[in-house]
């Protein structure tokens, strides 16, 4: 069994005293997993992994933009419609191109990249398939409004992390020169 921790941001913080408690609780979901894929940049998770001896049986595969990891992400080059992600893996410089420019999709693609490398797929194989990814339906909806307006509806969440995602999505929209947040 492979466990994948995608993101432990501010969403769903209710019920936890702090991020350390949240990280420990999320790790409990993977107590019986053989492998764990995660981002080392979320320090409460990294700390929880190193403190608990019963996680030592886990084969971990980490990725990071800041810390030493199995997949060290270096440069992100965002274009108009795609992003080139460069990294170091097993002392080799590798890269992939993904058809997304928003931060949430980039992070999700890096996690998928790490998982596929951990499973033994070649970077060429991964890159070819990443280029053909299609966006999935998200909670953010872009609708045509009245008087030449575009409306972005985020009906799912109202936490700070969700607001950041919605604002990032808004900045990418080029339909109208002016933007209003309600």
What are these regions (language model features)?
Residues 136-138, 155-182:
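Active-site beta-alpha connecting loops in nucleotide-dependent enzymes
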């Amino acid at each position: 069994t492979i466990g994948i921790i995608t993101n432990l941001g501010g969403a769903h913080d209710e019920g936890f005293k702090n991020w350390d408690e949240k990280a420990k609780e999320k790790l409990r979901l993977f107590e019986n997993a053989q492998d764990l894929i995660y981002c080392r940049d979320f320090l409460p998770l990294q700390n929880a992994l190193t403190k608990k001896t019963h996680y030592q049986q886990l084969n971990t595969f980490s990725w990071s933009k800041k810390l030493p990891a199995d997949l060290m992400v270096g440069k992100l080059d965002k274009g108009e419609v795609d992003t080139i992600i460069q990294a170091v893996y097993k002392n080799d410089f590798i890269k992939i191109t993904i058809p997304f420019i928003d931060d949430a999709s980039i992070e999700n693609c890096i996690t998928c990249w790490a998982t596929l490398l951990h499973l033994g797929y070649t970077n060429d194989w991964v890159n070819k398939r990443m280029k053909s990814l299609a966006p999935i339906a998200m909670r953010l909806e872009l609708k045509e409004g009245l008087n030449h307006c575009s409306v972005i509806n985020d009906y799912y969440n109202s936490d700070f992390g969700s607001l950041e995602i919605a604002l990032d999505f808004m900045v990418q929209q080029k339909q109208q020169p002016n933007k209003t947040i309600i």
